[in-house]
Each structure stands twice: as C-alpha cells, then as structure tokens.
Amino acid sequence: MKKTGIFNSEISRVIAKLGHKDKIAIVDLGFPIPSHVERIDIVLDFGRPTFEEVLKVILKELEVEQVILAHESSKKFEQIIKENIPRVEFLKISHEELKKLTNDVVAVIRTGDVVPYSNAILVSGVIF
C-alpha cells in the first residue's frame, strides 16, 4: 500500500505522466469540462472538497511554474493560490478563454467547490 503523497490513483497517475509545460485544471462544481479531456471527478458533496483542499494535496507531488486563472476570480481565490504557491507566475485571462484553454489540458479535476470562478489551470514546471 502507498504510504505518502496522493492516494487518488487517477490524480497520482496523471501527475506522474506530466512533463514540463503540460497542464492540468482544477475546477469548481459547475465548470463545463470538454468531453474529450480526461475528467477526474472527486466531488463528495456540495462544496466538498474545496479548490484549496485539492490544490494542497496536488502540490505534494506537482511542481507548478504558472497558474492561469480568470480575471473574474476573486482576490481571495488569488490569495489562496499565492499562499500555497508563493513564487508562482500568474496569467489572468477571461473566464471564456479559460474554458477554451481546458481543451488543451491533460486532465480536469472537478472539485465540489461552489465559489464562483474557483478554477485554475496549473502549468507543470521542472524541479531542477
């Protein structure tokens, strides 16, 4: 049995396969996920798990060099990301553009978060 890290086998598998500049998205409950993109649905209940809960676990195994989020996202949402990835580069685009960009991600992780615009694309970095 695995002792540490991410215990969700689908998320662990996707992160292990990511290369530099590959992208994954963490999205809220209502985000439209393209049908051709791998969907990892971890919704447990209305509001659970939150974006932040999922982000914290993913960061145990993923090096992130850039976060793409919508202009419409709240300052609190941006602060959550900054607190968890202090030196990350941000790219802000419209929510519509963010939805289009999810066509090019390796996978979308759907959370139970119900705070509007709690969606981000994480761009994989390198550890050296």
Curated annotation (Swiss-Prot):
This protein's pathway reads:
Carbohydrate metabolism; D-ribose degradation; D-ribose 5-phosphate from beta-D-ribopyranose: step 1/2
The UniProt annotation places substrate binding at: D28, H95, Y117, S118, N119
Q: Which residues form the active site?
A: H20 (proton donor)
Q: Which residues form a coiled coil?
A: none
- One example of a Gene Ontology biological process annotation: D-ribose catabolic process
Subcellular location, record wording? Cytoplasm
Listed EC numbers? 5.4.99.62
**GO CC list:** cytosol
Q: Which reaction does it catalyse?
A: beta-D-ribopyranose = beta-D-ribofuranose
List, alphabetically, the SUPFAM superfamilies matched. RbsD-like
A GO MF label = D-ribose pyranase activity
First-listed, main subcellular location of the protein, grouped into a coarse class: cytoplasm
What superkingdom heads the lineage? Bacteria
Q: Which InterPro entries match?
A: D-ribose_pyranase, RbsD-like_sf, RbsD_FucU
Name the enzyme group at the top EC level: isomerase
Keyword terms: Carbohydrate metabolism, Cytoplasm, Isomerase
Family membership:
Belongs to the RbsD / FucU family. RbsD subfamily.
The record describes its quaternary structure and partners as:
Homodecamer.
Biological role stated in the UniProt entry: Catalyzes the interconversion of beta-pyran and beta-furan forms of D-ribose.
Protein name in UniProt: D-ribose pyranase
The organism is Thermosipho africanus (strain TCF52B)
Lineage, top ranks: Bacteria, Thermotogati, Thermotogota, Thermotogae, Thermotogales
The record's gene field reads: rbsD
